Swiss-Prot record:
PROSITE patterns: RIBOSOMAL_L6_1. The keyword Ribonucleoprotein applies. Belongs to the universal ribosomal protein uL6 family. Signal peptide: none annotated. This is Large ribosomal subunit protein uL6. GO terms for biological process: cytoplasmic translation. GO terms for molecular function: rRNA binding; structural constituent of ribosome. This protein binds to the 23S rRNA, and is important in its secondary structure. It is located near the subunit interface in the base of the L7/L12 stalk, and near the tRNA binding site of the peptidyltransferase center. Keywords: Ribonucleoprotein, Ribosomal protein, RNA-binding, rRNA-binding. Part of the 50S ribosomal subunit. One of its GO terms (cellular component) is cytosolic large ribosomal subunit.
Length: 179
């Protein structure tokens, strides 16, 4: 049995959970999330806790047990507190700004790159170089942050590009001249 899957998921007061079979809907102050879980697990609710249990001892049920528990816990966390990813833009002339809901990134190309957020995701820019991606869905927030980082990944020689806040870029030595 999965150690992660054994833990009950506590529900905050403002969060409402409904499940029909393997589809689960979680509503909270930050939004509403829906997901269909894979076969092999069952969900049960007891007062302020959700329990995820494998339906049998087959390998697939055991594999999905911890995964489904983590997915449901992330949904509950997302609709109550939300998730954020912070990115830093490093380099002369590289900057970002928000126009309407669209993020416009100038990253050294001949044209600015526009990123349109999916529903529920918001972009915020601080000091033209720090981008904050927020939303209730952990997977979507991470995917959008990865898309923004992929516009200009950090290069190892000078460290220019778009990186996650706190990300360590391994630097390489440049060419050594003739002596």
């Amino acid at each position: 049995m999965s150690r992660t899957g054994k833990k009950p998921i506590s529900l905050p007061e403002k969060v409402d959970v409904k499940f029909e079979g393997l589809s689960i809907t979680v509503k909270g102050p930050k939004g509403e999330l829906k997901r269909t879980l894979p076969n092999g697990v069952s969900l049960s609710k007891d007062e302020n806790f959700i329990f995820v249990k494998p339906i049998n001892e087959k390998r697939q049920s055991r594999e999905m047990h911890g995964l489904c528990r983590s997915l449901v816990a992330n949904m509950v966390e997302g609709v109550s507190n939300g998730f954020t990813k912070k990115l830093e833009i490093v380099g002369v002339g590289s900057r970002a700004q928000v126009k309407g809901k669209t993020l416009v990134v100038s990253a050294g190309y001949s044209h600015p790159v526009e990123v349109v957020p999916p529903e529920g995701i918001t972009f915020k820019v601080e000091n033209n170089t720090n981008v904050i991606v927020t939303g209730p869905d952990k997977e979507l927030v991470g995917n959008e942050a990865a898309k923004i980082r992929a516009i200009r990944p950090p290069e190892p020689y000078k460290g220019k590009g778009i990186k996650y806040q706190g990300e360590l870029i391994i630097r390489k030595a440049g060419k050594s001249g003739k002596t």
